[in-house]
Each structure stands twice: as C-alpha cells, then as structure tokens.
Design a protein with these regions (language model features):
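Alpha-helical transmembrane segments and their helix-start/interface "positive-inside/aromatic belt" motifs
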Residues: 2, 10-27, 91-101
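Individual transmembrane alpha-helices with interfacial aromatic-anchor signatures
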Residues: 95-96, 130-151
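Cytosolic juxtamembrane helix at the C-terminal end of the final transmembrane segment
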Residues: 81-86, 153-174
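Hydrophobic cores of alpha-helical transmembrane segments in multi-pass inner/ER membrane proteins
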Residues: 66-76, 143-158
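C-terminal TM-helix exit segments that contain a strictly Trp-centered aromatic cap at the helix terminus
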Residues: 29-41, 102-121
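Loop-to-transmembrane helix junctions at the membrane interface
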Residues: 79-102, 106
Length: 174
C-alpha cells in the first residue's frame, strides 16, 4: 500500500468515525452530572434537587448506576470506531448499539413531545408532578434530553457506519 493510499484511507476512516466520537462525548457528558448528583452536588439537576432521593437505593441506581451505564455507553461508542473494537463481534455490537440508539432517541423525542403537549394545553401534569414541572430547574431537562437525542442519533450513525463498512474493509480497521 502506498503512502497516498494510507493517507486517503486514514482520512476516510476519520470521516466515518466522527459520529462515534460525538456519541462517546455525549455519553460522558451525560455520565458526569450523575456522579456529582450522587455526591450531593445539585448543579444542573433537572428539578428540585432537595426533594430528590438521597441515600437510598433509588439514588444509587439513578445516579451511580446510570453514570456507570453512560460510561459503558461511551466505551461501546468508541468500540464502534476504534481499532480495539474490531475484537468484538461486529453484528452483535451493531445490533445492540442500534437497539440502544432507537430507544434513546425515542425516549428523548418523547420528552420533547410531552413538553409541547404540556405547553399547548393538550395534557395536564398529574398533581404529583405539577410542582416538579413548574420548578425553574426543570428547564435543564431540555438540555439533558437534547443530549440524550444527540447521543442516540450519533450512536445509531456510528453503528450503521460500522455495520455497512464490513469486517474486511480497511478504512475503519486502521
């Protein structure tokens, strides 16, 4: 292989890999606040942090486990685009990633659909959630669910690119 071919292949691989890197970044951006919320720091919490569970199994799952799952999601996103990810079965990795992508994207878009329906007066919050929905910190939900949508879309793009790239193509394996 010539130097020009190697450079072209590396450039093509870089163009194909961007979605995996964006997905990994979104996953880590989602993970970080879960860890600081678990440590008791309420910054960027989408609601009233004082009324959120602390010191319970709900808090452990909601903060620490979800943070760890998001870090694992970043590792999966990188496995789709990095050479070490070639050790994993391509179809299995892509199937799991595409399934997660669809779920995360739908979850995020559902949040925005519900916010629209609330604003349009088509639905009314249940009394148990009305105060949470009216809290000024609830606006952070727009950011976090937007990040969730971005993560889902980019994970899907990276998985699709990996699946379509095939195991024997050199562009992504370098």
């Amino acid at each position: 292989m010539t130097t020009a071919t190697t450079a072209t292949t590396a450039t093509t691989a870089g163009r194909r890999a961007w979605a995996g890197y964006v997905a990994a970044g979104a996953a880590l951006a989602y993970a970080a606040p879960h860890f600081w919320w678990g440590a008791g720091v309420g910054a960027t919490f989408p609601g009233d942090f004082a009324s959120a569970p602390h010191g319970t199994w709900e808090a452990a799952v909601g903060y620490w486990v979800m943070g760890a799952v998001a870090v694992a999601g970043a590792v999966v996103a990188l496995a789709l685009v990095r050479p070490r990810g070639r050790r994993l079965p391509r179809r299995t990795l892509c199937a799991l990633s595409l399934t997660a992508s669809v779920g995360m994207t739908l979850w995020g878009f559902t949040y925005f659909a519900m916010q629209y329906l609330l604003a349009a007066g088509r639905v009314v919050s249940a009394p148990a959630f009305a105060a949470k929905d009216a809290h000024p910190q609830a606006a952070w939900g727009l950011f976090w669910y937007g990040l969730f949508v971005l993560w889902g879309l980019m994970l899907g793009r990276a998985a699709w690119t990996r699946l379509r790239g095939g195991e024997d193509r050199g562009a992504l394996s370098r």
